[in-house]
UniProtKB/Swiss-Prot annotation:
Catalyzes the 2-thiolation of uridine at the wobble position (U34) of tRNA, leading to the formation of s(2)U34. Gene3D superfamilies: Adenine nucleotide alpha hydrolases-like domains, HUPs, Translation factors. This is tRNA-specific 2-thiouridylase MnmA. Its main location: cytoplasm. Belongs to the MnmA/TRMU family.
Amino acid sequence: MKKVVVGLSGGVDSSVAAASLKEKGYEVIGLTLWLMQGKGQCCSDGLVDAAQLCEDLDIPHHVVDSRDLFSNNIIDYLVEGYQQGITPLPCSQCNKTVKFGPMLNYARHELDTDTIATGHYARIAYSEKEKRYQLLRAVDRNKDQSYFLYDLDQDLLSGTVFPLGDHTKTETRRMATQLDLHTAEKPESQDLCLIEAHGSMQTFLDQYIETHPGEIVDQEGNILGHHQGVHHFTIGQRRGIGVAAPHPLYVVDLDPGKNRVIVGDRETALKTECMVKRVNWVSIAPPQNPIHAEVQVRYRSKPTGVTIIPLDAEAPGGRVKLVFEDPQFGIAPGQAAVWYDQEILLGGGIIEAFS
C-alpha cells in the first residue's frame, strides 16, 4: 500500500485531498504545520479542524511546530520587503521554504515515504520529451494556484501529488458532502493567513515597521499630500491614497530613501517591460535564446503575450527581461511574474525593476 503524507490546513480542500486518497487505497498520514498563533486558515482553528478530520478518517495526525521557520522566512521577508519599498509575494516563498520543502523532508526522514500531497489546485505530469516534471494549470481555471507554485524544483515536484488538480471547486464541495466531512461547509479563506489573523496587511506591518510621515508627490516633485508610512502603499494602488484630485491618481513609484510616495495617472503606471530575478525554470530547461510565452504579473491578471530574453542561462537564480505585447498596469517589484505555454507553467521569478 502506497504511503502518502497529506498537508492539512483544516480547510475543505486539504480535507478532500486526504479523504479521496484514502478512498483510493493509500495509507494516508495527516501533517499540519503550526505556522503562527491566532485566528486563520493555517493557524489555531485550522489545527483543531485538521485533528478532527484525522480522527474522523482514522488516520494518524502529526503536527510540526514551524513557527520559527515561518517567522524567519515569511514574516521577516515581508517586513524587509515593505521597508525597501517593494511588495513581496509571501505565498510562493512560503510554499517552497516553509511548506513543500520541509513537508517532503519530514515525510522522508520521519515517516518513511517520499510522497506528499496537498489540496492545491494544480497538476503535475512527467514529460518524456523534456525529461522533467512539469507543472500544469488546474482544470478549474478560476481556482488554479499554479502561479503560487512556480518556485518548486524538480525534487519537490517529483514527490508531490495534487488530488484536486482535475476537479472543480464545486466538485470538491460535493465530494466533501458525499464523504461526510465536517469541513464540507467551512467558508473558504479569502486572504493571506497573516491578513486573516491581523485584519489587514497594514495592521500587520505596523507591528513591525515604525511609521514615518512623509510626502505624497507627483512625478515633478510637487507635494500633493502626506502619508503615514511608505509601507502602507503598493504600486498600482488607487484607493486610500488620501489625495484629492480632479482625476484618478495611482501610486506609480515608491521612494523609501526619501520617504516619498509618487503618484500619477493610469497611463504612467503602464509598463512595457520589466526585469525578473531569481528565475526558476520549471517545465523546460533554461533556454539560451529568447522565447515567446504568456505571462501573468499578478495572480488574477489576464495572461498576455511576452518575449522572454534570458540574461543569465543558469537556473535557479538567473535573470530574464520580459517585453510585453501589451503594456501592463501596476507592475510591482517583489511580486511574481510567471509564464506559461498554454496550460504548462514554464517558469517564473521575482519582478526586480521596470521601465
